[in-house]
From Swiss-Prot:
GO terms for molecular function: cytokine activity; growth factor activity; identical protein binding; protein heterodimerization activity. The gene is bmp2. This is Bone morphogenetic protein 2. Belongs to the TGF-beta family. CDD domains: TGF_beta_BMP2_like. It comes from Tetraodon nigroviridis. Keywords: Chondrogenesis, Cleavage on pair of basic residues, Cytokine, Developmental protein, Differentiation, Disulfide bond, Glycoprotein, Growth factor, Osteogenesis, Secreted, Signal.
């Protein structure tokens, strides 16, 4: 029975999303279809596979993702999704993990992707007074038609042990410790554009930040120019170089230098961080637009207000109107790769378009003429009850490469119905 339910859910979802003929669905809410007239198991399996492929293609996927249990969804991506979900709610606060940059970037993008670096590429020689690391992010999964509008490199840094704010420093601390308390050091981000044999990489500075030792937080660096060059084919992706300049001048103790090196989480510590490292790894976030529809943070207040107005109208029971339809991703096994939401209210349109068409049926002039002709010639069909207003939803999911994506998909929710 479970297989039948899943099959019917796929058929229902396919009809809603692909055919656009939601008025043909004779069910309300989560009411299940009857099993009458169903195809043979072999036919149904092939039919469902074809529909699933079409749906995955609509999502920009070549095959159904099967992420491993070790796949990590960065908290930052979850925060971005929640910020989208609260869009239009003026009382909702922006999460602390993100700045204004993310909000501005998301307002211009309909696709947000996150990438972790390839750890085997990260080591570079340590130089006196600074720590240097190389990072390579594989961006080949970004489609060619997606234009990158912005990109940020996010680095997590811990408070340096003993570097609490000056106000909290012990009165018995040494002079050097007091000088160090609440100190600063600099993080530089470079684009590597050449790697000569046996020499230091050739690089250009992208962004820099003077950071305080006494704070634990994420730092965001603008790397848009480099990522745009790489994804547009105008430059070769050799990765980034991160340089941490320690505040001590001249001779420094190795222990003190190592402490500052660990302050910025640019590499995994041996035999440590097994649990914390996945959520503290450097993260590259790209913001792009494929030319289809609204941005992730596009407001829906106007449509929702129009919908509330439509609900208040008194409509005849059998006339064309919107009905409840909830799509549960767990029913079709898609909750394995769709992180959020667990499902959504798709709705559908059903009802009569009788002559004469009433004003609340949201009809076009053509539908009025067609219904008028039908009243004298039954060979001409009546106008049909169809969606007249559709809105997007955002999905947070893992693709076939286990990359975490937040994307806005158009025309997924019926907001209004009418006779057309």
């Amino acid at each position: 029975m479970v297989a039948v339910v899943r099959s019917l859910m796929v058929l229902l979802l396919a009809q809603v999303l692909l055919e656009g003929a939601t008025g043909l669905i004779p069910e309300v809410g989560r009411r299940r279809y009857s099993e009458s007239g169903k195809q043979s198991p072999q036919q149904s399996e092939g039919f469902l596979n074809e529909f699933e492929l079409r749906l995955l293609n609509m999502f920009g996927l070549k095959r159904r993702p099967t992420p491993s249990k070790q796949a990590v969804v960065p908290q930052y991506m979850v925060d971005l999704y929640r910020m989208h979900s609260a869009n239009g709610d003026h009382s909702a606060k922006r999460p602390k993990s993100m700045g204004r940059h993310a909000e501005r970037a998301a307002s211009k993008a309909n696709t947000i992707r996150s990438f972790h670096h390839e750890e085997s590429m990260e080591a570079l020689a340590r130089l006196k007074g600074k720590t240097t690391q190389q990072f390579y992010f594989n961006l080949t999964s970004i489609p060619k038609e997606e234009l990158i509008t912005s990109a940020e490199l996010r680095i997590y840094r811990d408070q340096v042990m003993g570097a609490a704010s000056t106000n909290n420093s012990s009165t018995n601390s040494s002079t050097s410790d007091k000088a160090h308390a609440g100190g600063f050091h600099r993080i530089n981000i470079y684009e590597i554009f050449g790697v000569p044999q046996g020499r230091e990489p050739l690089a250009r500075l992208l962004d820099t930040r003077l950071v305080q030792d006494s704070l634990t937080r994420w730092e965001s660096f603008d790397v848009s120019s480099a990522v745009f060059q790489w994804t547009s084919g105008k430059g070769h992706n050799h990765g980034f170089m991160i340089e941490v300049l320690h505040p001590e001048e001249g001779e420094v103790e190795q222990e003190r230098a190592d402490k500052h090196s660990r302050h910025v989480r640019v590499s995994r510590s041996l035999h440590q961080d097994r649990d914390s490292w996945p959520q503290a790894r450097p993260l590259l976030v790209t913001y792009g637009h494929d030319g289809r529809g609204d941005s992730v943070l596009h407001t829906r207040e106007k449509r929702q207000a129009a919908l509330r107005k439509q609900r208040r109208k008194h409509q005849h029971k059998a006339s064309c109107k919107r009905h409840a339809l909830y799509v549960d991703f767990s029913d079709v096994g898609w909750n394995e790769w769709i992180v959020a939401p667990p499902g959504y209210h798709a709705f559908y349109c059903q009802g009569e378009c009788p002559f004469p068409l009433a004003d609340h049926l949201n009809s076009t002039n053509h539908a009025i003429v067609q219904t008028l002709v039908n009243s004298v010639n039954s060979n001409i069909p009546r106008a049909c009850c169809v969606p007249t207003d559709l809105s997007p939803i955002s999905l947070l999911y893992l693709d076939e490469y286990e990359k975490v994506i937040l994307k806005n998909y158009q025309d997924m929710v019926v907001e209004g119905c009418g006779c057309r």
